[in-house]
Amino acid sequence: MRVNPIIDAIRFLTDSPLFYVFDLLVIASLVIVAINLQRDPAQRSIKDLSMFALRFVMGCMWWQQSLWKLPPTYTDRPDGTGGLHDWVSKMVDGAAFQIQSDFVQYIVLPHFQIFAPMVYAIEVLIGASLITGTAVRLFSLLGAAMAINLWLGLYRTPYEWPWTYVFLIAAQLLFFILDAGRSLGGDALIARRLERTHARYGLGSRILALIT
């Protein structure tokens, strides 16, 4: 059967590892959208619906990318080869700057089982954040940082197109600048609650306002 986006989407929703977690995130996202639409008529706009759609799709991309680096090996093979380990190894020769190449070769790869869970957890959290629209400002910045690492780390790798990562960086920064989580996301619910309770002046509330 010829692979096409529709078949890929169906397989992604039904055959992927942890598909049930993804389905729960989608359900949570739709519930949050419904609550926002019911409570805030101002969000019933093309702008907010479009921002939600773009944020949701980007979150799905991050979630999908986490699926080929699942624990316990964080690779796509039982023997621990391929997957994340293979792509990290490419940074030794493909990094734009020697300092990043040396860091990968002498620090990251010898301690792969320490760094791999961190990469996996961050990607899962970025995906969950963008899908549900929660703490989007924080995780958009983390997503931009991850994309910068890929851009510079794979800059000289054959057949890689560096602009791919530049566009990803730009998208993540736009989500941060435009407060994408406040368009039909969990951040909108948090912001309204802080406004309603006048609790936004406390330290914890100020931190919460910064990351949402």
Across the structure, where does each feature detected by a protein language model lie?
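Extended, low-polarity transmembrane helix blocks
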Residues: M1-A121, T132-T212
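Transmembrane-helix motifs of polytopic, lipid-linked glycan transferases
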Residues: L125-S129
